[in-house]
């Protein structure tokens, strides 16, 4: 190992321009070679030290050859560099010649001592980089140059038979960790050119005419058999070192490459930060909540959540944000910019993350799985909200009534009940809504618009949600079948709701009267009977209704539209339910049976009235005399006795 210590023994000077080396100095004068057996005895740190010192020595030798012309004319003892190929002295060697020499030497460090370093000729145009023109080379430039040259000269030297010999142990030291074959999908076919000794003169001629603007990624073009340039080429897959043609200046401005994904960076510190994505390292931790981050800037932004600091303010509306990226996204609401478009359906988005999550609706990808019930979701936020079903967490509280919600959107909707705010008004009927989405759905009742089309069967839907539900019929291979009636569903949750019909389960209970319901929507509608809320108003007559469908049916009175016709007698009806009831007159169907006496009825209202005979219930009471009746029509006739009104007059 004494050779390692000898490597550093190169003449140096403490002042610039005071070095004087007698005679011709070549890189071989300061280089030390190991045999293959000696090289295998070195550990990784010793090999890195060897390469580091060799590059440092080469930097020193090169700097001696790049003094200014004025200094070169005045100095009495000028260093001269001899090319390793010809051994001829020259005062002003071309930078590509120097780099070619050192590349040959470094790539063959394992050659036996005393042998002439030899490498099948490489296109030295690749070595003619912009940073070669600098008078003083930096170590990182040479290091980056050598590594990039190795990556492009031989991605896998044992495969290419044109090279003539395997590259030495330095190549094994520089190359990244082994990557399983086929893991990288983006491969580039590159035709590499290597030259024999007899083509050296032609290669040199070509090198002298080369422009210093050549870059390594232009290698396939340079080695395509131009004027005065002969090449023997072979095709080779560069799985590990494939470089996109758009990555110009990678060797000039981005010399640091990631071995995991092939991405290039201009600074080594940026590469280290990037590599934390592959390793999962998060060295920056929040002292408040313990959350970790891979960058200090991300931690700084996160700390503003605890401190409440919002330094980035919108000049349009004055809204402030904790990070600059949030401000930029917000400003698109003022400019109306929607820069991200879905290639499948053409839908536009303000944020790229929204586009990515939206595209999962086309691919049916659901990467986020619940650990409790194994249900999968396409959005991480949806998974977070779903997990609150298992934990029972409801972090959003209403300040007016204290009611809690698992989602902030539900709290916002609920708060409008207390304020009575209904900012969204229908231009056709004047109906107002708390949410814009509800207004848009309502407006389709006037236009009969069905904008969402299924690409599989061509069916149209009024709401996007209905299209998503329908599309599962085509994409889902597994269906959930009811064991009682055999009905199938695309979702397990829908099957569970359906099974309540057979089991009679009613999990949603009213806190006012204790009545239970199968579905939450029915409970919400029922609660309006206690609150007296009638949110749906008719724009024609001002009448209010508890349900939107009741309003829709009522509005047909004003329009006199009767779209439902009886095919037996031709009678028309404004509601489909009325047509169904009427058709029982022709069919004689009586589907409603009394459990006490077995009497059947064609309408459920008639059955309810009949049951009062058995129960003795008289819910309709006269406010004048207190007499009670089982039917509201009987109460109406009775009240005429108190008023003296005689509404029925004989026409004769």
Curated annotation (Swiss-Prot):
Entry's localization field:
Nucleus
One Pfam assignment: KRAB
Primary location recorded for the protein, binned into one broad class: nucleus
Q: Which InterPro entries match?
A: KRAB, KRAB_dom_sf, Zinc_finger, Znf_C2H2_sf, Znf_C2H2_type
GO CC annotations on file: nucleus
Q: Which PROSITE patterns is this protein grouped with?
A: KRAB, ZINC_FINGER_C2H2_1, ZINC_FINGER_C2H2_2
Tell me which SUPFAM superfamilies the record gives.
beta-beta-alpha zinc fingers, KRAB domain (Kruppel-associated box)
- What family does the database annotate? Belongs to the krueppel C2H2-type zinc-finger protein family.
Role, per record: Transcriptional repressor. May play a role as regulator of the ubiquitin-proteasome system and autophagy-lysosomal pathway.
| Protein's name in the database | Zinc finger protein 418
Source organism of this protein record: Mus musculus
* Record lineage: Eukaryota, Metazoa, Chordata, Craniata, Vertebrata
């Amino acid at each position: 190992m004494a050779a390692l210590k000898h490597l550093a023994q190169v003449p140096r000077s403490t002042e610039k321009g005071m070095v004087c080396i007698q005679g011709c100095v070549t890189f071989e004068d300061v280089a030390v070679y190991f045999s293959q057996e000696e090289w295998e005895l070195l550990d990784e740190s010793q090999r890195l030290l060897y390469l580091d010192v060799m590059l440092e020595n080469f930097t020193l030798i090169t700097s001696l050859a790049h003094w200014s012309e004025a200094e070169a004319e005045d100095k009495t003892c000028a260093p001269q560099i001899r090319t390793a190929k010809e051994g001829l002295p020259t005062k002003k060697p071309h930078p590509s010649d120097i780099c070619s020499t050192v590349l040959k030497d470094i790539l063959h460090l394992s050659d036996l001592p005393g042998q002439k370093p030899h490498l099948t000729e490489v296109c030295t145009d690749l070595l003619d980089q912009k940073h070669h023109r600098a008078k003083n080379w930096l170590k990182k430039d040479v290091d980056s140059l050598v590594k990039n040259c190795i990556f492009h000269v031989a991605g896998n030297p044992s495969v290419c038979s044109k090279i003539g010999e395997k590259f030495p142990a330095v190549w094994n030291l520089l190359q990244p960790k082994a990557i399983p074959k086929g893991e990288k999908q983006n491969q580039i076919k590159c035709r590499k050119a290597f030259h024999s000794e007899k083509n050296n003169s032609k290669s040199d001629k070509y090198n002298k005419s080369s422009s210093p603007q050549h870059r390594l990624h232009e290698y396939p073009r340079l080695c395509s058999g131009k004027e005065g340039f002969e090449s023997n080429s072979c095709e080779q897959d560069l799985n590990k070192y494939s470089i996109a043609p758009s990555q110009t200046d990678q060797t000039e401005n981005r010399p640091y490459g990631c071995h995991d994904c092939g991405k290039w960076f201009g600074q080594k510190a940026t590469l280290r930060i990037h590599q934390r994505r592959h390793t999962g390292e998060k060295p920056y931790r929040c002292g408040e909540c313990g959350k970790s981050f891979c960058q200090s800037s991300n931690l700084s932004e996160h700390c503003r959540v605890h401190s409440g600091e919002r330094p980035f303010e919108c000049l349009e509306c004055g809204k402030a944000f904790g990070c600059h990226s949030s401000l930029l996204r917000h400003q698109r609401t003022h400019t109306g910019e929607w820069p991200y478009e879905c290639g499948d359906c053409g839908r536009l988005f303000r944020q790229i993350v929204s586009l990515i999550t939206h595209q999962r609706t086309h691919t049916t990808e659901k990467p986020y799985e619940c650990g409790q019930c194994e249900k999968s979701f396409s959005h991480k936020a949806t998974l977070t909200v779903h997990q609150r079903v298992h934990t029972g967490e409801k972090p959003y509280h209403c300040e007016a009534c204290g009611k809690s919600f698992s989602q902030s959107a539900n709290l916002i909707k609920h708060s409008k009940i207390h304020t009575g705010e209904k900012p969204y008004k229908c231009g056709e009927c004047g109906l107002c809504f708390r949410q814009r989405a509800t207004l848009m759905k309502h407006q389709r009742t006037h236009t009969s618009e069905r904008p969402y089309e299924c690409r599989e069967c061509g069916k149209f839907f009024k709401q996007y949600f209905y299209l998503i539900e329908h599309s599962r019929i085509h994409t889902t291979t597994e269906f959930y079948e009811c064991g009682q009636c055999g009905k199938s569903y695309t979702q397990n949750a829908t099957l569970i709701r359906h099974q309540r019909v057979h089991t009679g389960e009613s999990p949603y209970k009213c806190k006012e009267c204790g009545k239970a319901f199968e579905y939450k929507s029915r409970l919400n509608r029922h609660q309006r009977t206690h609150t007296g809320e009638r949110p749906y108003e008719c724009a024609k007559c001002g009448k209010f209704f508890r349900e939107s469908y009741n309003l829709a049916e009522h509005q047909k009175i004003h329009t006199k539209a009767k779209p439902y016709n009886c095919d037996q007698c031709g009678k028309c009806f404004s509601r489909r339910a009325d047509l169904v009831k009427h058709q029982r007159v022709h069919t004689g169907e009586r589907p409603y049976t009394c459990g006490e006496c077995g009497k059947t009825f064609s309408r459920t209202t008639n059955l309810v009235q009949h049951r009062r005979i058995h129960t003795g219930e008289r819910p309709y009471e006269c406010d004048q005399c207190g007499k009670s009746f089982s039917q509201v029509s009987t109460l109406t006739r009775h009240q005429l006795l108190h008023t003296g009104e005689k509404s029925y007059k004989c026409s004769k």
